[in-house]
Amino acid sequence: MALFRKRQNVPDEKEADRESGHRDNDETKARLKRGTRTRRITIGVVSFFYLLAIIFLILVEIGSIKRQPILRNIYIFKLDLSNILPQSAPSGLSLQNSVAKTLGLHDFYQVGLWSFCEGYNDQGITHCSKPDAAFWFNPVKIILDELLSGASIALPSEINDILNILRIAYHIMFGFFLGGLILDGVLLVISPIVLFSRWWSLPVGILSGISALVVVVGAILGTVIAYIFRAALNSQPDLGVQASIGTEMIAFQWAAAGFNLLAFLIHAGLGCCCTSRRDLRTGRKGGRAAQQTASPAS
């Protein structure tokens, strides 16, 4: 009879061991969750910064590729040719609403990263060029292609030097923004991995630094291109062409650059701050303190 009771108690002991194991496992998970709370919140903030940077970079990339209300207001710079002063004009021209229209040109041209849009002051944008990864805006070619036969415009001699610099800078800027967008997408996905160990902060931080660098350089190039182009054209009053800067585009570029810089600084800090899961398991650095504070609570 006693033997029967002893055998009956064996399953009870196994059940108790399983329940004890579950409790220990739950306590371990709770301790890890409490100990890494600051790091998890910080990673969430970093991921949010990358998401915002991606949104702004997408807006930068798709600006002025179509005539939609939002996209048509995003451009690097805009040329106003409505009061352009021709050097000569063919006889028999019928006077239009603007000098540019009379000469066969459009009143304005606004430039994005992939394409440009053109239109008239009384009609708005009438056409946007086909998006092209190799695009760069050559105003001389566009004006000469659209100018009516017999008409001519006195373009400044230094415009060719400016255009050569513009072409190189334009391609670099485009590549940097596109590369930054791809890197930000990768970082948005892999950033949570730094929760497990501080060592992951090194490769992720390096990738974050590269992303921040290319986006900041792209923003600098975009700003410099816009201001140089505006200064070059507005310094020629005899030409009658006015250039303006797209404040939305510049703002989006620097917003993306700012969020990338903040994300990089936080990633750099995660290499030496905020307890990781590995710290808790090994009892290293802040992990030992987190274990001591977590044990009484459990």
Model-derived regions: residue spans:
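Juxtamembrane membrane-interface segments at transmembrane-helix boundaries in membrane proteins
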Residues: 32-34, 158-173, 236-251
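Intrinsically disordered, low-complexity terminal tails of fungal membrane proteins
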Residues: 1-40, 274-298
